[in-house]
Amino acid sequence: MKIVEVRHPLVQHKIGLMRNAALSTKDFRELANELGTLLAYEATADLETEPHTLPGWAGPITVQRIAGAKITVVPILRAGLGMLSGVLSLIPAARVSVVGLQRDEETLQPVPYFERLTGRLEERDALILDPMLATGGTLIATIDMLKRAGARRIKGIFLVAAPEGIEAVKAVHPDVEIYTAAIDAQLNDKGYILPGLGDAGDRIFGTRVG
């Protein structure tokens, strides 16, 4: 499995800012989108290009363009929506597929409640968006959905990932690539990442208590 912890200074600076528990909803949301853009930049670095000739200002010129890649971006509800605008700013022609899975707080297992995938997935690469890769259960369930629908290549983009979640996904889907701003220390007994970011969904949407 390809696992990329993006060490670019801008990425590390921004994820550091997001760890501040006193950060406003506005700032947290903006940083999530900015990191979505930066991480998507890394995740798409291996897209193939092809030469294309067009009329330049001084005559015909040959340039490079993406070689027919079709991409669907897959935000996992609801927190993944907080990274979507940033990714689409980089890949505006991408189709958006949406998956909803909610973690059972007792079993820590994902419970699906929504699935709306774009058509012709067998022709597309999929970029899954979720701020947190914790136990890996939600990601595994999402990958299962995408593979059943025929997605040809799948990558996951996360703000923070836990080693336990990475290993769980690796055991089931070793062909999937993971891109993250940080691999944190561990999960606690509730399945939350430490030191983590807190509840990313609540922080993005301003629904946290207090």
Curated annotation (Swiss-Prot):
For this entry, the protein name equals: Uracil phosphoribosyltransferase
Query: Which positions are annotated as binding 5-phospho-alpha-D-ribose 1-diphosphate?
Result: R78, R103, D130, P131, M132, L133, A134, T135, G136, G137, T138, D199
Catalyzed chemical reaction(s) = UMP + diphosphate = 5-phospho-alpha-D-ribose 1-diphosphate + uracil
Cofactors named for this entry:
Mg(2+)
Per the annotation, how and in what number is the cofactor bound? Binds 1 Mg(2+) ion per subunit. The magnesium is bound as Mg-PRPP.
Supply one GO BP term: UMP salvage
Q: Which gene encodes it?
A: upp
Look up and give the organism this protein is from. Stenotrophomonas maltophilia (strain R551-3)
Q: Tell me the InterPro entries matching this sequence.
A: PRibTrfase_dom, PRTase-like, Upp_B, UPRTase/APRTase, Ura_phspho_trans
* GO MF entries: GTP binding; magnesium ion binding; uracil phosphoribosyltransferase activity
